[in-house]
Amino acid sequence: MHYFPVFADLNNRPVLVVGGGGVAARKVNLLLKANADVRIVAQKLNAELTALFELGHILWIAGEFNSEQIRNVFLVIAATDDEYLNERVFRVAESQQKLVNVVDDQARCSFIFPSIIDRNPIQVAVSSGGTAPVLARLLREKLEALLPQHLGAMADISGKWRHKVKTKLKTVTERRRFWESLFNGRFSQLLKNRQTEAAKKELELQLDKDYRGGFVSLVGAGPGDAGLLTLKGLQEIQQADVVLYDALVSDEILELVRRDAKLVFVGKRAQGKQVAQENTNALLVKYAQQGKRVVRLKGGDPFVFGRGGEELEVLAERQIPFSVVPGITAAIGATAYAGIPLTHRDYAQSAVFVTGHRKANASDIEWQTLARSNQTLVIYMGTLKAKDIAERLQQFGRAGSTPIAVISQGTQARQKTHIGTLTALAEIAENAPTPALIVVGEVVTLHDKLAWFGEQKFAQKRPHFTLDSLRIESVA
């Protein structure tokens, strides 16, 4: 690290600016925001600086620069178009061990100005160390868009209440949970709407509550690629005390969980070791009743074949508060990464999602509906029943030549797309690693044209082998 980032307290501290033009004015305005005692050395001032002088905001030392002017100041800034004068200011400041900045001359700077995102009292500074100022500015612009304007008001009010909160809530965990809940709740929304007094009242009401009760967030982790986790989902897993996750949550996403959170595996896999749903429900209740902030992290979307509704029913019965963060379901993510659009005007006017893993006493499937042409059928957890699925679809009218895809480990680096026809579905599914998704419909023919994920697409190398009507393509 070439520059050490610090935030300097300039309140009422003397700062010397040498120069009276536009560049100097920009620096002066920045310094005044920090309540610095600004002194300007210049033969003359531009209109902006003249106005500040006449208002009494700055002290003007009219005349030439000399070394005595630096003696009792905290910072020195040289902002003239005279290279010789700037060099002299730098050397004098260095000799007196003063922090000095010569504008646009990094070699003559003992400190530099970062790009600033100001949400007073919250401040974010971005610097490239002078190597790429345009890049730093672009980064600042992105952060400006991300950080809400009311952050400063949130920090200001919470700072005034810190002592009361510390008195009321004795443990660090209680206080952390209180502030996290406050900043992510109605308090923040009121400040966003410029309802400051109502926000203060909300804080007071929340503090009077008993915050020992826990909370559960049901979060969809998406299909695997960590980049597809929603921003709100990321916020939830980084605030959690306990995360209960299933087998479909990728290691990439688990790496994003708060480091000191407890990770509890509650996964289910067909023909594998499973955690019973009743045990998962019991754990959710147990941790919430211990006053913990619990995240139930599910692959894909928790309300699409994820039994999320069943888990929330248990929480509702016990009056445990909860929230839901949707995720990108596997049918959306995996097909997109495989270059298979779910709908297309030429091939499919609808898409149907079904599960191949049904409750033992479930009513029979409407195969006639699933076998319709001009639609895309996506089957979750269907590889073990692929033979029966293929037979039933053909029995109810789907042609054996209908294109199909089996997408394994969708959206992840290990993704494999297995292409074939309905007659070969059982054979294809048997050779496909799980978890896998079955796609049935003419849209699969677009895969060759639209596949984009994986290095081999761009290298024009598509390793494959043929097994009757089976083709396997790997992105690994």
Curated annotation (Swiss-Prot):
Residues 1-203 are annotated as: Precorrin-2 dehydrogenase /sirohydrochlorin ferrochelatase. It holds the Pfam family NAD_binding_7. Its EC number is 2.1.1.107, 1.3.1.76, 4.99.1.4. Coiled coil: none annotated. Keywords: Cobalamin biosynthesis, Lyase, Methyltransferase, Multifunctional enzyme, NAD, Oxidoreductase, Phosphoprotein, Porphyrin biosynthesis, S-adenosyl-L-methionine, Transferase. GO terms for molecular function: NAD binding; precorrin-2 dehydrogenase activity; sirohydrochlorin ferrochelatase activity; uroporphyrin-III C-methyltransferase activity. GO terms for biological process: cobalamin biosynthetic process; methylation; siroheme biosynthetic process. S-adenosyl-L-methionine binds at P223, G299, G300, D301, V304, T329, A330, M381, G410. The keyword Magnesium does not apply. SUPFAM superfamilies: NAD(P)-binding Rossmann-fold domains (SSF51735), Siroheme synthase middle domains-like (SSF75615), Tetrapyrrole methylase (SSF53790). Residues 214-476 are annotated as: Uroporphyrinogen-III C-methyltransferase. Pathway: Cofactor biosynthesis; adenosylcobalamin biosynthesis; precorrin-2 from uroporphyrinogen III: step 1/1; Cofactor biosynthesis; adenosylcobalamin biosynthesis; sirohydrochlorin from precorrin-2: step 1/1; Porphyrin-containing compound metabolism; siroheme biosynthesis; precorrin-2 from uroporphyrinogen III: step 1/1; Porphyrin-containing compound metabolism; siroheme biosynthesis; siroheme from sirohydrochlorin: step 1/1. InterPro entries: 4pyrrol_Mease, 4pyrrol_Methylase_sf, 4pyrrole_Mease_sub1, 4pyrrole_Mease_sub2, CobA/CysG_C, NAD(P)-bd_dom_sf, Siro_Cobalamin_biosynth, Sirohaem_synt_dimer_dom_sf. The active site is at D246, K268. The modification Phosphoserine is found at S128. NAD(+) binds at G22, V23, Q43, K44. In the N-terminal section; belongs to the precorrin-2 dehydrogenase / sirohydrochlorin ferrochelatase family. In the C-terminal section; belongs to the precorrin methyltransferase family. Then it catalyzes the NAD-dependent ring dehydrogenation of precorrin-2 to yield sirohydrochlorin. Finally, it catalyzes the ferrochelation of sirohydrochlorin to yield siroheme. This is Siroheme synthase.
